[in-house]
């Protein structure tokens, strides 16, 4: 199974790149984790936010593999504790499909992305900066993987 993070935004601060790449490199070869960055639409004073969201959504969905399971990252999604996320990761692996995780831009996700999703995952009821979400998702999934393989990274 491959994991794919599809995220709006292409110019992340160095600390985001460093943190994300650190976890990316830790993933085993049988579970590669890739990042696809979608350019954010220009948000000027008179920007048509609805149209920008639609365009970002189209680009995000176009980046997703044909049979991939789509999981959105969204506040109203399901909150998983770490052991629950590990169980979810195991279910995804057993399903045999690749998983695409979608992170929207400043206004969130397009309705088309939400409609295409089989699941929605909430990291927190708090509103989080989108760059930080990349690092949190990578760390959380790595920790979940470590639980499923009895790797010493996760400690109770």
Swiss-Prot record:
One of its GO terms (cellular component) is cytoplasm. Its EC number is 2.1.1.177. The keyword Transferase applies. It catalyses: pseudouridine(1915) in 23S rRNA + S-adenosyl-L-methionine = N(3)-methylpseudouridine(1915) in 23S rRNA + S-adenosyl-L-homocysteine + H(+). Coiled coil: none annotated. S-adenosyl-L-methionine binds at residues 73, 104, 123-128. InterPro entries: Alpha/beta_knot_MTases, RlmH-like, tRNA_m1G_MTases_N. SUPFAM superfamilies: alpha/beta knot. Pfam families: SPOUT_MTase. It is found in: Cytoplasm. It is an enzyme of class 2 (transferase). Keywords: Cytoplasm, Methyltransferase, rRNA processing, S-adenosyl-L-methionine, Transferase. One of its GO terms (molecular function) is rRNA (pseudouridine-N3-)-methyltransferase activity. Belongs to the RNA methyltransferase RlmH family. Specifically methylates the pseudouridine at position 1915 (m3Psi1915) in 23S rRNA. PANTHER family: METHYLTRANSFERASE, RIBOSOMAL RNA LARGE SUBUNIT METHYLTRANSFERASE H. Homodimer. This is Ribosomal RNA large subunit methyltransferase H. It comes from Yersinia enterocolitica serotype O:8 / biotype 1B (strain NCTC 13174 / 8081).
